[in-house]
A protein has these predicted regions:
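Short alpha-helical transmembrane segments in multi-pass integral membrane proteins
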Residues: 1-37, 95-160, 207-265, 322-387, ...
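N-terminal transmembrane alpha-helices
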Residues: 24-61, 75-90, 94, 119-126, ...
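Transmembrane helical elements of multi-pass membrane transporters/channels
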Residues: 35-58, 156, 219-223, 227, ...
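Generic alpha-helical transmembrane segments of integral inner-membrane proteins
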Residues: 41, 45, 49, 53, ...
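Hydrophobic/aromatic residues within transmembrane alpha-helices of membrane transport systems
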Residues: 42, 46, 54-58, 70, ...
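Interfacial/gating helices of multi-pass transporter permease domains
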Residues: 58-78, 145-149, 209-214, 260-264, ...
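Small-residue-rich hydrophobic transmembrane alpha-helices
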Residues: 67-127, 164-176, 180-183, 294-354, ...
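Short runs within selected transmembrane alpha-helices of multi-pass transporters and secretion channels
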Residues: 81, 85, 153-175, 183-191, ...
């Protein structure tokens, strides 16, 4: 792992050192968690920045209507990450336990089984997006021109769906094997390629939204090839050795491992679908407030997604470190790792929220210049900065639950936060005098409720008991 200083790693270590001064964490544990986390955080920053740049390029080339069209197609693309991310969330727990127990053969079959499962889930999406993009976009979009832009974008980006899902499996496999550096290089490199290709296709060839979609597809294919070759050969030129190798001449499916993967991954898929699926009714409800509020709300969500990137590393680092300890049969060590990363995560998110909150107006100016809309966007950005603090608790608590196989509670947490609180509260703003205040509150409860639920489950300690059913020995005895 390279030791060169970088800002992301520096912030994580700074927060960890402050916590260590108060005796809340051990410095060496913070350092190991940081080394595993920061490459994933950089990957998250690259991906979220790429999404922002994509929209900016389309807007500069074609105007706000094209941005709206891509926005209408975006929830369908995010379904890929809901499905693939859920399966990959089960994969990382199973991989980390087998890596900790040196069960190399089981680890390899776990990865190939995960790949087959994720292809089975996402190939139907590819077919649907290619065959009927207009029908799908029209379900959530308004305006013939915007819907047409969204339709053209979705049809082309459909070709990248299975590759994006496979990249999640490859990334989580390496993180589960204590290597976050390699996935960062591959996926962040893919994000850079994506931005460059989009600039060429959108501006150089004038392909508009189709060019943006083509850049996304090609970049995802290249990253998938990198993961596949690296895992099959155990190394890649320039990048170097992989911590695990997945031989191609072996059975690719194992029914018992597939059952364990389904049991651990299905609730995570459900939790992701609860979050992603809510984008559809949420867009409809916010649309009732008018276009100005819609633009402000979308900006707030983009800002919060960018600020939420620490969980890309910290939550998965927790899953990996906790899973390895559980795979070794050391529940006490697993608990210490879980508490360490949770405290580090909470500290990082509090620092991020407190640092950026005073700059809400400046952040808003990066997205809009209209003085009539700027104050509203500023308030939404401020609320987004405040609400993201709860994601530190949620991500830090979900990590050990994911590692142990106790994945139902994060699913329940997402359902409660979005469907029992956030969406009804947002609609209440439309039918009462609360107005935008209800939307502000919905942004907060959307993160606060899941944080409370997952933290409660983590503190109960039940996850340690659940993990005993999914450890390598248990799998072999079934």
């Amino acid at each position: 792992m390279p030791s060169t200083y970088n800002p992301v790693r520096g912030v994580l270590l700074l927060v960890g050192s402050l916590l260590a001064r108060f005796g809340l964490v051990e410095r060496e544990r913070v350092r190991r968690a940081t080394d595993l986390s920061w490459p994933r955080v950089v990957t998250g920053l690259a991906r979220m920045s790429k999404s922002t740049a994509d929209v900016a390029m389309v807007g500069l080339a074609l105007g706000p209507t094209a941005i709206a069209g891509v926005g209408f197609a975006a929830p369908f693309w995010e379904l890929v990450f809901a499905l693939g991310g859920g399966v990959a969330g089960g994969t990382i727990g199973m991989v980390s336990q087998r890596y900790g127990a040196d069960a190399d053969e089981e680890l390899a079959v776990t990865v190939t089984t995960s790949a087959v499962v994720v292809l089975g889930l996402t190939l139907p999406l590819t077919a649907a997006y290619w065959a009927g993009p207009g029908l799908l976009v029209d379900l959530v979009g308004t305006g013939a021109e915007a819907v047409e832009y969204g339709t053209r974008y979705l049809r082309v980006v459909a070709l990248g769906v299975p590759f994006a899902a496979l990249n999640l499996i490859g990334s989580r496999t390496l993180v589960g094997a204590d290597d976050a550096w390699t996935p960062m290089l591959l996926r962040a490199g893919g994000a850079v390629v994506n931005i460059v290709l989009n600039a060429v296709f959108v501006f150089g060839f004038g392909l508009g939204v189709v060019g943006a979609a083509m850049g996304t597809v090609i970049a995802n294919v290249l990253v998938t090839v990198g993961f596949a070759v690296g895992l099959a050969r155990g190394r890649l030129p320039v990048i170097g050795a992989f911590p695990v190798r997945i031989p191609v001449s072996r059975p690719f499916l194992d029914r018992e491992l597939g059952r364990d993967l389904a049991e651990t991954g299905a609730p995570l898929v459900g939790a992701n679908l609860a979050r992603t699926g809510a984008q559809f009714p949420r867009l409809f409800i916010v649309g009732l407030f008018g276009p100005g509020v819609v633009s402000a709300y979308v900006v707030a969500l983009r800002v919060r997604a960018l600020l939420d990137t620490p969980n890309w590393g910290l939550s998965l680092a927790s899953s990996s470190l906790v899973g390895q300890a559980l795979g070794d049969g050391d529940e006490a060590e697993a608990t210490v790792w879980a508490e360490t990363v949770l405290r580090l995560s909470v500290g990082v998110y509090l620092v991020v929220a407190a640092t950026l909150l005073p700059f809400s107006r400046g952040i808003a100016r990066l997205f809009v210049s209209d003085p009539a809309v700027l104050p509203l966007v500023t308030v939404f950005v401020a609320v987004a900065c405040a609400s993201v603090a709860f994601r530190g608790v949620d991500g830090g608590s979900t990590g050990p639950l994911r590692a142990s196989g106790d994945t139902r509670w994060p699913f329940y947490a997402q359902l409660a936060g979005m469907y029992l609180f956030a969406l009804p509260l947002a609609y209440l703003g439309h039918v009462t005098a609360l107005g935008e205040l209800a939307l502000y509150a919905s942004l907060v409860v959307e993160t606060a409720v899941p944080a409370a639920v997952t933290y409660y489950r983590f503190r109960s300690g039940t996850w340690r008991v659940v993990s005993r059913s999914y450890r390598p020995d248990a799998a072999l005895d079934d």
